[in-house]
Amino acid sequence: MFTIKEIERQARVKLLDTYEDNYRFKPTEIFDAMRDGLRMIRNVRPESKYVDGLLTGKMLVINGTESDFTVPESFPATIGGTTYTLDQFRAFTVNMEDRWMESLVYYVIHQMYMKDDTDTANAQLAQAYYTKFTESVRS
């Protein structure tokens, strides 16, 4: 399993969006794309719901407990009665085996480039990363 922070970091590196004081994409935008990507992977590959041979019901693990992937509008945020900072949210574990991580990164990048699709180059990049996503999920 891997953390939200790991996916965000890998996506930002490929998006050339690593200057923390001036991110082009807000963390919540990346988290929304991540949640949607997890849903896509689970729909296309139902076996992705299994971790170490056990069926998982929820997309995140928060403090050892499975949880839905709810993206707050801002931080600090209250989830399930507990308030979390942005860094604490980033430390949540994604309830999926590591082999799906690369596919999820591709999906996040695709979604971020879709936001900039008025730029022809970004529209092409969005399509290229969606193709990488679909190929990696289906292989």
What do these predicted regions represent?
Residues 1-139:
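Glycine-enriched, solvent-exposed interface loops adjoining structured elements
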